Amino acid sequence: MDNRFKAGDYLFFQLEAGFALLRLLAVERDEGDIVWHLSAFSDLFPDVESIEQAIADRNSLTVSVPHVVLTDRAFESTQVSEIANVSVTPEEQEIVT
């Protein structure tokens, strides 16, 4: 299993106009390949501190894509950084299965 990130991680990446946020729901192997299960938020943030505040009050985040599956190659092409880890909820686990 890939050890870069783990389920429950909040990952951010930079866009032209600020930062966007993803949540890693699960990481699994599919026939030897790594598959990443993510949710995406519609919120954009001007800086990292704003992301940290939003994660602290997770109810303020708006999920735009509840579940997307990426191959390892597609995931690696997006440069993300981990900012926090919060256990995946039972509702989030249901989305993946």
What is each model feature region?
Residues 18-28:
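Short beta-strand-centered aromatic/proline hotspots
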Residues 6-10:
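Loop/turn positions that initiate beta-strands
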Residues 27-52:
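Basic/aromatic-rich interaction segments and small domains that mediate binding to polyanionic partners
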Residues 44-97:
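Intrinsically disordered, low-complexity, charged/polar segments
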Residues 1-4:
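Short, surface-exposed secondary-structure edge patches
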